[in-house]
Design a protein with these regions (language model features):
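Bacterial Sec-dependent N-terminal signal peptides
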Residues: 1-31
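Cell-envelope and extracellular/periplasmic
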Residues: 29-290
Length: 290
């Protein structure tokens, strides 16, 4: 084999290696940054009210990609920051994503980072995340909800996709976290509506269902006098529509007096359970509460 042939083969392998280090959008990825998309209603937003113990210290390996500007915290949309709550928008609070991420980094190898992208809208039906028909629902939304929708350029689904694509430049999407259903209580078509949304996300982000599970959390449980607890039966049917869906139990997670939202202690436990569900799916042992 002459020198010219050897040089050509080295160049060819260099191109192959470069391709392996780029994601589908042509950007270098950190395969040790695990990214999780979060969406839903006010419980996934994080209900206002953050207790002192939840403000820190937060491991620097757990970060949030700001989906909107946070002027009061100096966060700029589209950039990564240490995941000190609130994670969704400036007016939101502690939610399940907080202790999901904290529990993950406590149980994953020290070289693994965790990133959250949270686009959620209080009070919304799942129809707001319908890629093709969201405008029909959004046009009937009350003004306070419209104001939230407008922080996402009027299209929360598309905004989530855009933020997720930014996150894909820096990491690999490993899962989708959903907490929604209060506004769809007793809607038997909810699993199919979630399926359509999930499939659209998978397609639009060039993902594979077998590599990106969907974790759906129950609503405030009946044993906490949850106002929408009847919806948990329908939520439990989601794996029949989406084989890669997993249900996170809310039993024992403390609720607030409104019977719709979780208390801070409830969010801590619930977020830990999301993480305990995700860890085996990532190939790691089940988490102990830390």
């Amino acid at each position: 084999m002459n020198t010219k042939t050897i040089v050509m083969k080295i160049k060819a392998w260099s191109f192959v290696l470069a391709g392996l280090l780029l994601n589908a959008n042509g950007f270098p990825q950190d395969t040790n940054r695990f990214v999780f998309l979060c969406l839903g209603q006010s419980n996934m937003e994080g209900f206002p009210g953050i207790e002192e113990q939840d403000n820190g210290p937060v491991d620097e390996r757990f970060q949030v990609l700001a989906a909107v500007d946070f002027p009061n915290l100096g966060r700029i949309k589209g950039n990564w920051y240490r995941a000190v709550p609130p994670l969704c928008r400036p007016s939101t609070g502690l939610g399940p994503a907080d202790y999901f991420g904290r529990t993950l980094v406590s149980n994953l190898p020290p070289n693994i980072k965790v990133g959250i992208v949270n686009v959620s809208v209080a009070g919304c039906k799942i129809e707001l995340f319908d890629k093709d028909n969201f405008q029909t629902y959004a046009s009937t939304a009350p003004k306070w909800m419209t104001n939230i929708i407008n922080t996402y350029s009027g299209n929360p689904y598309q905004h989530l996709v855009e933020m997720a694509k930014l996150a894909q430049k820096d990491g690999v999407i490993k899962g989708i976290l959903l907490h929604q259903g209060e506004s769809n209580t007793n809607d038997k078509q909810w699993p199919e509506k979630v399926k359509a949304m999930y499939q659209n996300l998978i397609k639009d982000l060039d993902l594979k269902t077998e590599e990106v599970p969907l974790l759906a959390g129950e609503l405030v449980n009946a044993e906490q006098q949850g106002a929408c607890a009847s919806m948990n039966k329908i939520i439990g049917e989601l794996p029949q529509a989406i084989p890669t869906a997993h249900i996170v139990s809310s039993q024992g997670c403390t609720g607030r007096s409104d019977h719709l939202h979780f208390a801070p202690a409830g969010y801590r436990e619930f977020g830990t359970r999301y993480a305990q569900t995700m860890l085996p799916l990532l190939g790691y042992r089940n988490a102990e509460t830390k």
